[in-house]
């Protein structure tokens, strides 16, 4: 069978029902956010747009029960989203590989522009709950990319130009290795100390043990809170470490081995790092 080539569409930080606080936190950390969006599925969000990928800060309106997975999950990094240009083909490939997925689902959100409001339309192929216990994994097919990647939203005080890396912490990384091999084929992953890496376009997903996570991030890492696996950290490319430092130092950031690191407790449960 032909496996899809993994590319990164976006990453998701869950702020549950605290969208105002979540958005303000990420603005203070130097991200330019889009105006608030409201999905037809019931969730709401702000985006930080980069060159070819983006960060989504997502929440559920208080009292709204249409997106229970948002309120049932802890705050923090909760979604890693692959790109696809053909959601039907991706769905067929996942089925053939034995990966439990839902059929493609379509939704939209209005985007208010100077010339008027238009609907951004998406179709996703989501892995079923429990397949990746660390959080949500899915594919996103954009039908209106011009409404999402707009230049006025791609300039950030912290200098971010893209997502370099996402980190998953797992007591047994081999479980994720087996899943990613089923999704993307033999040779999609390679070993690293305490785990493995999946190359995702110009980015990468590292799946590492708690020991390796602690060595790299120390007390800046998220609290495992009894979880065997969880999505832990994001590393962003920046055009200037000084810009990243100026934007984040008020949030408890530190400089460490050529990077700027923001502790999870200052970024709604997700450790953030900035690199050149």
Task: Identify the residue ranges that each predicted region occupies.
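Short acidic/glycine-enriched loop/turn segments that link adjacent beta-strands
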Residues: 40-44, 256-258
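Conserved catalytic-core motifs of GNAT/GCN5-like acyltransferases
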Residues: 33-39
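Conserved beta-strand edge residues that scaffold enzyme active sites
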Residues: 40, 108-109
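Short beta-strand scaffold segments in enzyme catalytic cores
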Residues: 46-48
